[in-house]
Curated annotation (Swiss-Prot):
<feature type="site" description="Interaction with 5' end of substrate DNA">
    <location>
        <position position="340"/>
    </location>
</feature>
<comment type="function">
    <text>DNA repair enzyme that can remove a variety of covalent adducts from DNA through hydrolysis of a 5'-phosphodiester bond, giving rise to DNA with a free 5' phosphate. Catalyzes the hydrolysis of dead-end complexes between DNA and the topoisomerase 2 (top2) active site tyrosine residue. Hydrolyzes 5'-phosphoglycolates on protruding 5' ends on DNA double-strand breaks (DSBs) due to DNA damage by radiation and free radicals.</text>
</comment>
<comment type="similarity">
    <text>Belongs to the CCR4/nocturin family. TTRAP/TDP2 subfamily.</text>
</comment>
<dbReference type="GO" id="GO:0070260">
    <property type="term" value="F:5'-tyrosyl-DNA phosphodiesterase activity"/>
</dbReference>
<dbReference type="GO" id="GO:0003697">
    <property type="term" value="F:single-stranded DNA binding"/>
</dbReference>
<feature type="active site" description="Proton donor/acceptor">
    <location>
        <position position="258"/>
    </location>
</feature>
<feature type="binding site">
    <location>
        <position position="145"/>
    </location>
    <ligand>
        <name>Mg(2+)</name>
    </ligand>
</feature>
<dbReference type="GO" id="GO:0004518">
    <property type="term" value="F:nuclease activity"/>
</dbReference>
<keyword id="KW-0539">Nucleus</keyword>
<feature type="binding site">
    <location>
        <position position="115"/>
    </location>
    <ligand>
        <name>Mg(2+)</name>
    </ligand>
</feature>
<dbReference type="InterPro" id="IPR051547">
    <property type="entry name" value="TDP2-like"/>
</dbReference>
<feature type="site" description="Interaction with 5' end of substrate DNA">
    <location>
        <position position="290"/>
    </location>
</feature>
<keyword id="KW-0234">DNA repair</keyword>
<dbReference type="GO" id="GO:0006302">
    <property type="term" value="P:double-strand break repair"/>
</dbReference>
<dbReference type="GO" id="GO:0046872">
    <property type="term" value="F:metal ion binding"/>
</dbReference>
<keyword id="KW-0227">DNA damage</keyword>
<protein>
    <recommendedName>
        <fullName>5'-tyrosyl-DNA phosphodiesterase</fullName>
        <ecNumber>3.1.4.-</ecNumber>
    </recommendedName>
</protein>
Length: 350
């Protein structure tokens, strides 16, 4: 893995007591909190994973948690809209692995909003995207803002990958590309009911080396004015990740894409789900994935920079390397392949 500048992103080993930089809620009365979780799950006809995520956010106040659940469109949609059935995998079929079991194993994932909606130099930019993907050679690739026009360079990656599109033929869509050694069992697409921007949640279920893997790619609602829709979508995604993990003990899960999130919009994260950039050490050199100070493909944003693109993961890896790709300007058109940098994370067990 190589960085695009002279500063090599840090590689940080994750100790057992190291959690996300956002912090961990400590529970003083475990029995009392467990009782609240059971009561919440019984009243709402949900589960204790959902109960824990809401109760943690409101300081374990059961009444406030119930008010949040029944008063929020996000949770009503999660409860009422049967957007997806449960996983076909039986609970307990997958043995729970440790870092010691995986010693020497490495898996890489790249996520990139390739800005297909911008028609300027699109054919050239898509060729550059394909060239960079081949150079970095990730095992898994999440793409957002894919369009039918000038798609040929992406389609040609099928010589290296199995390609799954969310809703090809739509104005724009997402794609998941997996290496040929990845055995795909199922591909699902969930259309967000509250989206006015054709946004979806794309899920590929399969295995690699006998290990159960779930790949979850999304492009959440854009722009500050659509904060409520975006937060509801993110909450749904995290609930779905928690459900997958609960139904498939010992699985590997990777969730990411262009989340368009501001830090203050992040709701609770399920236990055991980590942010790859945080796991790699929170290096400020790799923080900003949409950086209009360094990337001038988009004008008029006065140097705004955001960490819109993120990867979350679940599994027994104990080392994460995180880098940004696509930061070289294309000589022929003097622009970058996209207004977003690609994020690339390599997970390993040492």
């Amino acid at each position: 893995m190589s960085s695009s500048d002279n500063d090599e992103p840090k590689v940080v080993e994750i100790s057992d007591d190291e959690m996300e930089c956002e912090g961990v809620v400590e529970v003083n009365n475990e029995q009392s909190d467990e009782a609240k979780m059971r009561e919440f799950a019984e009243i709402t006809a949900t589960d204790e994973i959902m109960a824990q995520s809401i109760l943690q956010d409101v300081g374990w106040d059961l009444k406030r948690a119930l008010d949040v659940f029944f008063g929020s469109d996000a949770f009503k949609e999660t409860r009422n809209e049967a957007v997806m059935g449960p996983s076909s995998s039986a609970v307990g079929n997958q043995p729970v692995m440790t870092a010691e079991d995986l010693k020497g194993f490495e898996l890489s994932l790249m996520s990139w909003n390739i800005d297909g909606l911008d028609g300027r130099s699109l054919a050239t930019r898509m060729k550059a995207v394909a060239t960079i993907v081949k150079k970095v050679n990730p095992d898994i690739l999440f793409l957002q803002e894919v369009v039918d026009r000038d798609l040929e360079p992406i389609d040609k990656l099928q010589s290296l990958y199995k390609i799954y599109y969310s809703n090809k033929g739509c104005q724009y869509y997402t794609a998941i590309l997996v290496s040929k050694m990845f055995e795909v069992e199922k591909h699902d697409v969930v259309h967000f009911q509250n989206s006015g921007m054709y946004r979806t949640l794309q899920i590929v279920e399969g295995s690699i080396g006998g290990m159960k893997v779930f790949l979850v790619n999304t492009h959440l609602e854009s722009m500050r004015d659509h904060r409520a829709q975006r937060m509801a979508q993110f909450s749904f995604c995290m609930d779905r990740c928690a459900e997958i993990i609960a139904n498939n003990p010992g699985c590997f899960l990777f969730f990411g894409g262009d989340l368009n999130l501001r830090d203050e919009e992040i709701s609770s994260i399920p236990d055991g789900v980590l942010d790859a950039w945080v796991s790699a050490g929170c290096d400020t050199k790799t923080k900003w994935t949409w950086d209009t100070y360094k990337n001038d493909n988009k004008q008029g944003f006065n140097g705004a920079k955001m960490r819109f693109d993120r990867i979350y993961w679940h599994g027994p890896f104990n080392q994460v390397h995180f880098s940004l790709e696509g930061r070289q300007r294309i000589r022929s058109c003097l622009c970058f392949p996209s207004d977003h940098w690609a994020i690339n994370a390599t997970f390993s067990a040492v």
